[in-house]
């Protein structure tokens, strides 16, 4: 039987009086064959410092629990089984009581009013097996952003217990198509990663394709056909302000943000060639990356921003290639029958997802 040990950092800034902690070993998730056993975690009700915050505290807990359970790595311990109830946020939990009901981890929190009508969520994460506090944080935000506060809290727990990067506080941007056949309307839309908070963004009047969101969830890139040919548009999500990215004589398409959000890789069709270019967003400086009579497009950055994977027919058929993000020789990585395209690097950088077309 393999065991996957999850690294647990030492406690961060404690929110209350100093606590006595014991050094414990890492929490473990047991992997039997191909099946992952979710980590049991207890999440008592969030204590509202003001009775008027009771409903909102329950909503925040619901989102946190849903995020953790949806990841497939955590299992919520049934609150009906709790031995210790009404645990004070500033107190040390009775670790034995939580271990007795099978909880490996315990998350406690309280919701408080903050200055200027804002909210403050304080939370602490405990290792019930190692009898220690693993994490203590506070988040402050506007009342209407309570879902984002919940997602950020879930992100902190997820990263602390798995060592993986957070993703709950992220958004999905897409093209929404509605209306009867023959009168379909396409609109640029955005929603939280859990499908909530759907809203439509003001966009170009014509066809909109392939939207990409920036790493900080503040801007979006997409292809607009307002001028009759594909052009890349950069839009601020909050203000709706739009601008065309560059003024090129040919077609521009397939944009994607760099991991730091400071650069965009794109394809430009100039003088009969379609090559990859990188553009700095601060000064709009353009840098050519490939020089090939083939079609080079659909580039995606590696998580560290040092490499690019893209599709090209330079070898006679549509295949995948990897090259340095600063430019340089490209190495083919796909072989065999079919056409390979639309590559995207995984967040950890160990895998590349792509499409493969066989036959027609």
Predicted features, each with a name:
Residues 129, 192-196, 236-240, 280-284, ...:
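Short loop/turn segments that connect beta-strands within beta-propeller blades
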